[in-house]
Amino acid sequence: MKVVILAGGLGTRISEETVDKPKPMVLIDDKPILWHIMNIYALQGFADFVVATGYKGEVISEWVSTLKSPWNITPVDTGLDTQTGGRIKKCMDLYPGEKILATYGDGIGNINVKKLMKFHESHGKLATLTAVRPPARFGYLDMKNGQVIHFGEKNQSDAGWINGGYFVLEPKVSSYIHAISEPFEIGALPRLTNESELMAYEHSGFWQPMDTLREKHDLEELAREGNPPWLREI
């Protein structure tokens, strides 16, 4: 089963790291975050990857050509200005009739892909996304009449659910993407929702995007501590 990884964006919010390389090639513990994402799948038996490239895609292609790995990795140039929906569609159209796994090239977590697949197969809809809790960035205050009565750290579980990627997509999802200039989150996902064809697999475990330098440093700290949650066998 193909795993499509979206790896073509500019990474403007972490531009200090993406002047000479695409965001998925930013290093976490001496390996690109792209490697960590692929390893999440490979540890669970999914090792046939299609990497949708765009900005500085040649850096990814060169890295793949020198990588010593049992994984099957196919970089696909999906265009510099193509949006996430277009990148998914271009990759899906290369493999007509195939169900795919897909995710973003900048978010890692200890997602149980086999449980995700089982959930998808149980409901019979066209698409499943993985719903996650956004990482808590701020503490909280309880106040009464201006006096602080409790000061604490916000738990990740206190926040609502968001789209964390890690999709399962049936072949027909390609027809819900109407233009390569259309973000998947603005076009296809709302259309699928309106037709009751989108389900959410709730993941309460570890999940962390790498949108900022602070988040990169947080991931590096977890990696340096040894046995980070996304590298453990699930």
Annotate the PLM regions.
Residues 2-5, 13, 27, 31-104, ...:
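Conserved N-terminal catalytic core of the sugar/cofactor nucleotidyltransferase
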Residues 10, 21, 56, 134, ...:
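A generic "binding-loop/recognition-motif" signal
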Residues 16-19:
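Conserved catalytic-core motifs of eukaryotic protein kinase domains, centered on the activation segment
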Residues 25, 140-143, 200:
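A structural signal for short hydrophobic beta-strand segments in well-ordered beta-sheet cores
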Residues 54, 76-78, 130, 201-203, ...:
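Conserved beta-strand termini and adjacent loop/short-helix elements that scaffold enzyme active sites
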Residues 55, 128-141:
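Short beta-strand-to-loop element that shapes/binds the nucleotide-sugar donor at the catalytic cleft/hinge
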